[in-house]
Every structure is written in C-alpha cells, then in structure tokens.
C-alpha cells in the first residue's frame, strides 16, 4: 500500500509539474480566445462579383491609422484568384477598396505582408501553389518581383512542386520563411534579401500528426515572438479529404524545434488560416478562411 501511495504521489507531482510548464510556455493570452463578435465580420459578396467568395489566408496589419486587410477573392466563373484590400478603424467594420481587385492580372492567394522601412512586401501563392514576392509603397499598387528561390542546404534548388503558405519573421538581421509542400509538413528557410532562400534543414521543422487533429495536413500562418519564445499559429486538418480545417498553435525557442499545444485545436468549426493582431489588452485572433471571424484573448 505504501508503494502504491508513493507512486500516486509521484504521478501527481509529474502531472502538476507538466500542467505548470504548459501554463508557462502557453500563456492563456496566446491560446485562450472567445468570440469578439459572434458572426463573421467579413465575407465574400455572395453575388457574381470577382470576390463572390473568399478563401485561404488573408492578412491584417494594424497601423496608426487603423487596420489593413489583404484577402483573396474568386468567383466560380473565373479560376484566377484575385487580390482585394479593405480597411477598418476598429478591426471589425470593414470597407472594401474602391479599385478592387488590385493587381487584377496576377494570381494571388494565401498572402502574408511585412513592412520593411517605408515599403510593404507581400508573399503570396500564385498558380501552382508556388510563392512569389511583390512590393508596394502604398499598400494597393503592387509590383511583381517574381518567384522566390529556395535552395536546399547543399546549395541545390528544392525539388519541383508546390511551396506555398509563406510565413515570414525577421530575427537579428535575417528573415526566416516557413513554407509547406502540399500541406505535408512545414519547412524553414532563411534569407537576407527576401528573394533568395536557403533551407535551415531539409526536413520539416513541424510535421503533421501524430495527433488526430493535424494528421492529414499542416501549414504555418504566422509566427510571433513573445516573452522569450516563438509562437507559431498554424492550420491543420484531421480529414484525409481536407474537408475541414482548424486553428492551432505551437511554441519554439529556436524556430526549429517545436512543441504543439496539448489542447489544440484552439479554434475548430472549420475556422482556419489564423493570425494574431495585438490589441489594447492582449491579442485578437482572426480566422481568415473561408469567412473572417474575430476572437479576443481571455
């Protein structure tokens, strides 16, 4: 009996320690969210316009003058995916840009935007799920810079095929790119100039599975730095046919070794392509596919 009590005590200590560690590396402000608005705050028009429907990851930047959103619109009558732009004072009520779609001749979806100096750089998927780079001085007129180039650690180009859902973070003078290949895993590359990239390693830094919620596909949407850790917000699917996706989070100290949140997914109900935006208190979480919903951290 004494031995059994000792084992129970040891297991209790282990689980308490594990729970405390999870609370430390996954603070509630980054993983616990409640709806700020119950219904979707931005959707496709539902009528035969260029943005009858929206899809994939859009991106939101919060600046001094308000919120700026880039999104992908499409219609059943046109296979090309187009870029839209909208603005908001509060991040909830959005106004579409009068000249949408912007850059109407280019296939643009799954966008990610960073600001470097006075210019904005957009990473986006083109036709065939390959990533290309664009630059703008005013957020609406974008100049194409061509496909980014990714090499393996041995200097050879990565194998032909998809390299999409680009996600970029700047760290100590370098840029780090997370990308997926047919949602089979998430790879990491680095660059000094945003166009030429070299893999940090040739294997994924975040794999799908083994848990059911991300068993059949993963893609990184955004990585932020918070109190000594990197937090990666990614979407995933538990279904082989990809019929439904969820929003999830993982943590890392070095961008290479990741620990998934034990209570993933943080948002279900087929709300995915999740991004984080700072708020007056805590953070907002926006899920961008296939309607935009907004959540507030607890």
Positions of the model-derived regions?
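Hydrophobic h-region of N-terminal signal peptides that target proteins for export
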Residues: 13-21
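Carbohydrate-active catalytic/glycan-binding domains of CAZyme proteins
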Residues: 23-298
